Amino acid sequence: RIWAATFAGGINYISQGEHGETVFINHRNNLKGYPIDVCYKARFITSDNNGRLWVGTTTGAVAFDENFKKPEDIQFHHFSRVPNDTKSLSNNDVHWIIATQQKELYLATFGGGLNKLISISENGHGEFKSYSVLDGLSSDVLLSIREDHKQNLWISTENGICKFVPSGERFENYDERSISFRVRFSEAASTLTSGGDMLFGTSNGLFMFTPDSIRKSSYVPPVVFSKLMVANEDVIPGEKSILKVDLDDTQEL
């Protein structure tokens, strides 16, 4: 089955008519249950490991069973941010959704950081765990996500690339200081090559790297004292000063 997301008319299921013609099934015909009144701006469609399709929209996420017989019978579940409910989505603008090798589902939001699906109840209520700059993200504006062969997630953000290690819930950030130049990543523009390289779209071409070659620096810079001030005034070395010789040559005060 082929699905298409539109930024004005929700989603479309592309099928064939009785005479082989292409037919677009949407909220105007047989896709009656889709919440078009609130989720008409769809950004992204993907499947998870439990037979569900997920739609990222500007007003939350929509999920439904992909094993349906007739489009009109699909039951859609809409998940959105609920004020004061920390187990709901942290932000409604969902840019990207990824199902991982560990059968987990993560959602990248524009302003609410990263969300992980914890569970969906029988009545369709979703529980999520969110990660933000308070947890180590470099930015809460996330644009896309890719998973490497070690099951780490690489996230393009407004402030560079972020590596998320799900097993330890740990973030490693790589900004322009790490990359040596400023990169402005594009929305929902990334892929993983057959060789394991990551490619992310930017405002100035493609940004490509091999995940295994990206490591945090272990260099610990030395502590160097260059100036001594007392009461907001510089201390000059001298016989009547508490600093007898230059600060570089002073062992203790």
Regions found by a protein language model. Give the residues of each.
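Conserved beta-propeller blade signature
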Residues: 1-4, 52-55, 104-107, 152-155, ...
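Solenoidal tandem-repeat scaffolds enriched in leucines and small polar residues
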Residues: 5-9, 40-44, 49
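Beta-propeller-forming repeat regions
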Residues: 9-11, 206
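Residue-level "micro-hotspots" composed of small/polar
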Residues: 19-23, 28-42, 59, 68-98, ...
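A structural signal for beta-strand register positions
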Residues: 49, 146-149
